[in-house]
Amino acid sequence: MANSQNTATVRDFLDAAWNRGDTSVIDRTAAEHHVEHEPDGDQLGRDHLKETVLAYRTAFPDLQMSFEDQIADGDRVVTRWTASGTHLGELNGIGATGRAANVSGVFIHRLADGQISESWSMFDQMGLLLQLGVIEFPAPDGISS
């Protein structure tokens, strides 16, 4: 029973926040002292989670995520997702490119007392930057592009 409740909580959060931009869902699905584990250090609190969602939803106003797989075990829920959208706003210093992007990734959420207490996110950042035209792969030696 706990696995299905945890899965429902995570699905509610992901769909409302990421697909509809409704960050109010975070107040009921995420713990007050939520920890978002990021490559540059842990970020604490619901407000940071809201800011993250809003940053991506502002940069990609038509952002849509599809949830390909979801697996729950104990207090963890793992979700494999694909996101698509059009880059129409600034994101991390990258001005709007007007380009469409499609990336995949994985969220891991740990729940405690029915709320998301920790989150990890891994996604194809290199693929996103390539699709936005921010970076290019260099042509191998001897091959002209």
Give the label of every model feature segment.
Residues M1-S145:
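C-terminal and inter-domain tail/linker signature
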